[in-house]
Regions:
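Catalytic domains that recognize anionic headgroups
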Residues: 1-149
Length: 149
């Protein structure tokens, strides 16, 4: 994890001092992972700052979850539950909300609903207002017709 964050996000210590997982303690792995989360948070905050004064939406999907010692498993190479619940978020500017209130209303209505990464494609198309024969609004979190894929 150490290569995924810089000094500004190196808060949790001790962190990884080796690329060999077996050489690291549970605490080092957790701290290193937490530092990567700080780096991701900072990155997303920087993007939001760039978009804040525009009519814009940001959609973030993590590509996978992470195992942090559950059942003795670490990282994301094994098939287990934490990998099936990756992080996701949608942020929109005030200007986007003023321009597309129905889209924002639908996103708010769907905010606690489960989603799969397969909905990302349809959500992005719908949020951008791209109408296409391949757009499935039942797979879009921007739609009142959303149904978990």
């Amino acid at each position: 994890y150490g290569s995924h964050y810089g000094e500004r996000d190196d808060l949790f210590r001790p962190d990884a001092d080796s690329r060999e997982i077996s050489a690291l303690s549970h605490e080092q792995l957790i701290n290193s992972y937490d530092n990567t989360i700080l780096a991701t948070d900072d990155f997303l905050a920087d993007i939001i700052d760039l978009l804040r004064d525009r009519r814009a939406i940001m959609i973030y999907y993590s590509d996978h979850g992470e195992s942090l010692g559950e059942n003795g498993r670490y990282l994301h190479g094994a098939e287990n539950a934490p990998l099936h619940h990756p992080a996701a978020m949608i942020w929109w500017s005030d200007e986007y909300e003023k321009t597309y209130p129905a889209r924002v209303e639908a996103m708010r209505a769907n905010r606690h609903r489960r989603a799969k990464t397969t909905s990302a494609f349809h959500t992005v198309l719908d949020a951008a207002g791209i109408d296409s024969p391949v757009l499935d609004r039942e797979a879009s979190l921007v739609s009142h017709g959303y149904r978990r894929p």
